Amino acid sequence: MEDKNYSKGIFYILLFASIILATVVLKITSSFFIPLTLALMLSFVFYPFVKNLTKFHIPWIVGIILVVILAAVAFFIIGNLLVASCRTVLNAYPKYEARFTTVYSLIAEAFHIPFDENSSLIINLWNSLGVRTFVQNFALAASGYMFSTAKVILVIALFIVFFLIEIRGMKEKVKTAFPEEHLNRKIMFIITKTIAEVTRYISIKFLISFFTGLLVFLFCFIIGLDFAIIWGFLAFILNFIPTFGSILSWVLTTGFAVLQFYPSFGKILYVGIAVLAVNFILGNIIEPRWEGSDLGISPFLILVSLSLWGWLWGFIGMILAVPILVIIKIICENIQFLNPIGVLLGNKTNFNNRKRNFSFFSKKN
């Protein structure tokens, strides 16, 4: 018994050391693993489309090429719209910098706060933070984004093509590599379940984010908020980050509405309420209904995962945090010695329900 406990202790120490080592490797080699992971997640999204195309007697490889080309065209169109908007931001920045000073002076006057443009804390903070330099650099970088990332996009597209090719032949490869029936069924079930759950999560998240961005764009366009395309895109992309992304989108859009429309409180309230309502209705009412149930992951661990992957891979890491956590949880639930980690990653009730679904992997089978 003591030897068994000792071996378990050694195993968990080695597991912890391996996690630390893997974290360091992922941080150092992020330029390689970020495109690879993005391609893997996008492959999960594209897989159902390619599979459905085969029903129309379209060969698998042709379906892959069609889906990738359509995605590339969509990226190109959206990218060009964003580049044009970023150039507009660069040209309009001096106007909004002056507008910020005006708005601040009006607010200071309304609340009887002493205002001196040369010594004001807010103005000095604005200047010391280098907001002007940041906006100019960001706009210039965004303008050249399509050219500087062309290589990365090509690499991701190639990864997607090969991932989708491999997925189709995965079942035969697993059967050949693991001829034992029980082990074969277990591995295939883990792979199938992982693909199904991650595909469902990313697909629903993409649709919700798309409609969120579209509605935010329309509301901003109707009220006349400048750079409506940028606010719509920010709402779309930030919605992939659970909770915090929607909050950040609302703060940025409403903050800019204050900058542009103050002292017209009606328009400011319109923007704030519209963006808040879109995020609340789509994120808290429609999305849970589409998903049917949550992913069974502890909210605290989602927060930890967002922080960890944000530190490792930046903004892209925060977008990928939840899908990666889903994959880890599914694997841990179906490998006996990793079951305790699966329990810690999820809610106890959800884990027990899932465990019943995987019960045919028990040894008696």
What are the residue ranges of the model-derived segments?
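Hydrophobic transmembrane alpha-helices
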Residues: 42-43, 70-74, 160, 233-244, ...
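Hydrophobic alpha-helical transmembrane segments of membrane transport and translocation systems
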Residues: 268-365
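Anchoring transmembrane alpha helix of integral membrane proteins
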Residues: 1-84, 160, 176, 325-326, ...
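Hydrophobic alpha-helical transmembrane segments
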Residues: 4-21, 87-108, 142-159, 213-223, ...
